Amino acid sequence: MFKNTFQSGFLSILYSIGSKPLQIWDKKVRNGHIKRITDNDIQSLVLEVEGTNVSTTYITCPADPKKTLGIKLPFLVMIIKNLKKYFTFEVQVLDDKNVRRRFRASNYQSTTRVKPFICTMPMRLDDGWNQIQFNLSDFTRRAYGTNYIETLRVQIHANCRIRRVYFSDRLYSEDELPAEFKLYLPVQNKAKQ
């Protein structure tokens, strides 16, 4: 999808405020919902993915199962709200041995397991909004001893709220981020009466 696109800086694949946030995504819902709502904490539109079973409610990109993203930028960044329920996401990458590897992170697992084609790992989320930063190049090297070439697919499962999902060429400090890539929490008015 993005193979022939010049890739530097930031490449966003989901922005909850956009006119069609799931334009390049496919949705699967069983016993749950995927809808856009206003989050009270940030007073802004977000995408809510909720389901009784994490494996049957998710969004996946690209929408066409035969296509791949072709994103070479090595950092995946997701701005996600912890709903204090089970949550998992999965990223499929291609390495320099031409092997497709999957990385699955979840908040209900306690150990990391590396198998030939999938690496599952625990993820701890803070209360409220989180910025998940995933160094795909480093994970590929540490888990498989190979080099990251590109990201093929991203799948985000229930249960979470999503503000933005993007790739970047490196990790940026808060000051370096473009305004629309930051998560603004409304300033609490602490004036004393």
UniProtKB/Swiss-Prot annotation:
Predominant cellular place of this UniProt entry's protein: nucleus
Cellular compartments per GO CC: axonemal microtubule; centriole; ciliary basal body; cilium; motile cilium; nucleus
Protein location: Nucleus; Cytoplasm, Cytoskeleton, Microtubule organizing center, Centrosome, Centriole; Cytoplasm, Cytoskeleton, Cilium basal body; Cytoplasm, Cytoskeleton, Cilium axoneme
Superkingdom of the source species: Eukaryota
Keyword Nucleus found: yes
Gene Ontology terms describing biological process: cilium assembly; positive regulation of cell motility; positive regulation of feeding behavior; protein polyglutamylation; regulation of cilium beat frequency involved in ciliary motility
Entry keyword set: Cell projection, Cilium, Cytoplasm, Cytoskeleton, Microtubule, Nucleus
Coiled-coil region list: none
Record PANTHER family: ORF PROTEIN
Function: Cilium- and flagellum-specific protein that plays a role in axonemal structure organization and motility. Microtubule inner protein (MIP) part of the dynein-decorated doublet microtubules (DMTs) in cilia axoneme, which is required for motile cilia beating. Involved in the regulation of the size and morphology of cilia. Required for axonemal microtubules polyglutamylation.
Family stated for the protein in its record: Belongs to the CFAP20 family.
Protein name as annotated: Cilia- and flagella-associated protein 20
Protein source organism: Xenopus laevis (African clawed frog)
Gene name of this polypeptide: cfap20
